[in-house]
Amino acid sequence: MRLRRISFVLAVVSIFAFASFASADILAPGATGAPDVLAPGGTLLASLSGLWTNTTSTMSGTYLTAVYSDPANTFGAGDLDFVYQVTNNANSVDSVGRTTAINFTGFMTDVGFTPLGSSLGAGFVNGTVIPISVDRSGSGDSIGFSFTPPISAAINPGQTSTVLVIETNATNFTSGFYNLIDGGVTTVAAFEPAAARVPEGSALSMLGISGIAVLGAMKRKFVS
């Protein structure tokens, strides 16, 4: 009887642990919020760096993006972190007010930044400009990092962003795109998740219903 009670308690703890995970600070499609302070890292799977110039040639700089298999990922050990860093050259006369990454349709995301970029290696540095807010499009494909208002909070000439982070439940990736926005849009090569698992809403619903059903069945068994 004691063993049954212990099993019942463990089942309850497991279900509430999942509920706590499900209510974590996850950026759902259509949502806007404050960025989380995250700690990406792990095994570097791929990286890209390059130069960029906006369409009116009033601004230019460098960018770096990478994918890590993260043992401490929000969604599961080994799931993928997508990270980005932008530098605006000192001779630019315009500022980067926003960036967006695509395509994250069908994946769960926890979005924010880390001020400790150099800990990642791969050329990342400890940038100084943090996003004011993060958002996700209604369809879930686009993840945005906004640095304004005020304009003084943008990635101004001579400045480098903190490392911007999108933790996901993806386990595979492919080529994607990253946009730098100052009124116009400059698009550069990046990475995106691939081979989506069960869509997030369905996954949560199915697991939640299953957990309730199991708990109910166990309770009836123990009572009887």
Task: Place the predicted regions along the sequence by residue.
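Short alpha-helical segments used as structural interaction elements across diverse proteins
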Residues: 1-2, 216-218
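Bacterial N-terminal signal peptides that target proteins for export
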Residues: 1-9
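Bacterial N-terminal signal peptides
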Residues: 10-17
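Sec/Tat signal peptide C-region and signal peptidase I cleavage site
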Residues: 18-24
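Extracellular or exported targeting regions of proteins
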Residues: 25-196
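A short, hydrophobic C-terminal helix/tail in secreted or cell-surface proteins
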Residues: 199-217
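Short, charged juxtamembrane terminal tails flanking transmembrane helices
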Residues: 220-224
